[in-house]
UniProtKB/Swiss-Prot annotation:
Family: Belongs to the ZIP transporter (TC 2.A.5) family. ZupT subfamily.
Membrane topology: Multi-pass membrane protein
Alphabetical keyword list: Coiled coil, Ion transport, Membrane, Transmembrane, Transmembrane helix, Transport
Any one GO molecular function term: zinc ion transmembrane transporter activity
Name recorded for this polypeptide: Protein zntB
A Pfam family it matches: Zip
Compositional bias ranges of the Polar residues kind: 360-372
Function per UniProt: May transport divalent cations. May participate, with dstA, in the regulation of the differentiation of stalk cells during development.
Compositionally biased region (Low complexity): 147-159
Protein's cellular compartments: Membrane
Length: 372
């Protein structure tokens, strides 16, 4: 088999791996959709759990990796660029729940005022008529009282419906914002999986499995608020699917079309910006939504469980795939750096260092690289 044929096979494998990794986001959405009993309390725990996963990814994986590669100052600059960028994006996401609530309140208040004025007017007219007929006055008063009670019941029902619609609109906007953040996060992940798979399946497969593992709770974070707000399984699944498909799209756009522009510095800058996006999304969208349905203590507990889950998923995957370390693993580790587009491999940066010194650094570095 020629080198060109081998390269073409690796490209096909890389694209398939990116597609499978992206589909795991939809798996998280399916889990939420097919839970038999939906409750707001469960939604609060799911949002808190997903917040913990995203915080852990940002501060224990993406940002440390970028700091190591492009420096503390540059990584932090791009981190805050990501925050500003996502804050601007959120301005275009509908958040009309507050306005809706105020508007409904205003309409309700105006309606009540008009009704009161109309009622007073009727009473004046009735008083004039009642001078001639006292019996009719009593009957009309009773009728007016019944009409007021019926009108009040209608207002209460309308107010309840408006309140529910306001809450549903809020949850829907949270889901859309989360989908945008996850989509932006999946673009560089697709590039990472693609480049790693070009180096070989022994490098690409562990990375794909690792990214797929943390895409599942991300899918849950997208689907939970949308499904709770709309009740539409298809809409919740659709947003998860679109978010996940950003991985193969990212691989195609950045890995194939703009391959020559994807420098190590640019990739690490993108990952630092993604860390900022995810942190801001947690602070601005996920946690405030979670606090509406669970207490702060309950939210904190689920948040920490999410971090622990992600921590163990990393080590479980590394224990199941030991060939990525030691011996051939050193070579694989070097490839993994290349796969992420990093600016150095151990053979280059440590030049005269012994093979043993490379092996010592491999497990720690690869644990950071696995989810970049």
């Amino acid at each position: 088999m020629t080198s060109l044929e081998t390269y073409n096979d690796n490209v096909k494998t890389a694209l398939i791996m990116c597609f499978l990794s992206g589909l795991s986001t939809a798996i998280g959405g399916l889990y939420v959709i097919f839970i038999k009993q939906q409750s707001h309390k469960l939604l609060g725990h799911l949002l808190s759990f997903s917040s913990g996963v995203m915080i852990y990814i940002s501060f224990m994986d993406l940002l440390p990796e970028s700091i190591a590669e492009i420096g503390f100052y540059n990584a932090n600059i791009w981190f805050f660029v990501g925050i500003i960028f996502f804050a601007v994006i959120l301005r275009f996401v509908p958040h009309d729940h507050d306005e809706s609530g105020d508007s409904n309140h205003a309409h309700s208040h105006n309606g009540a005022s008009i009704e009161k004025h109309s009622s007073e007017k009727k009473e004046v007219v009735d008083d004039d008529d009642d001078d001639n007929n006292g019996k009719d006055k009593k009957q009309k008063q009773q009728k007016q009282k019944q009409q007021k009670q019926q009108q009040q019941q209608k207002q209460n029902i309308a107010k309840s419906k408006n309140k529910k619609k306001s809450k549903d609109d809020y949850l829907n906007s949270v889901g859309i914002a989360t989908a945008i953040g996850v989509s932006l996060h999946n673009f560089p992940e697709g590039v990472a999986v693609y480049l790693a798979c070009l180096k070989g399946i022994d490098v690409g497969l562990p990375l794909m499995l690792a990214i797929a593992a943390h895409n599942i709770p991300e899918g849950m974070a997208v689907a939970a608020p949308i499904f709770s707000a709309t009740g539409s399984k298809w809409k919740a699944f659709k947003y998860c699917l679109y978010s996940g498909l950003c991985e193969p799209v990212g691989a195609i756009i950045f890995g194939l079309i703009f391959k020559e522009y994807m420098t190590p510095y640019l990739i690490q800058s993108m990952l630092a910006a993604v860390a900022g996006i995810m942190v801001f999304m947690v602070i601005k969208e996920l946690l405030p939504a979670a606090f509406k349905y669970v207490s702060v203590d309950e939210s904190a507990f689920s948040n920490i469980i999410g971090m622990i889950f992600f921590f163990f998923s990393i080590h479980f995957l590394h224990s199941m795939l030991p060939h990525d370390h030691g011996g051939a693993g050193d070579g694989g580790h070097g490839h993994s750096h290349g796969g992420h587009g990093h600016s150095h491999g151990h053979g280059h940066s440590h030049g005269g260092h012994s093979h043993d010194s490379q092996h010592v650094e491999s497990p720690q570095s690869s644990s950071f690289n696995a989810f970049a």
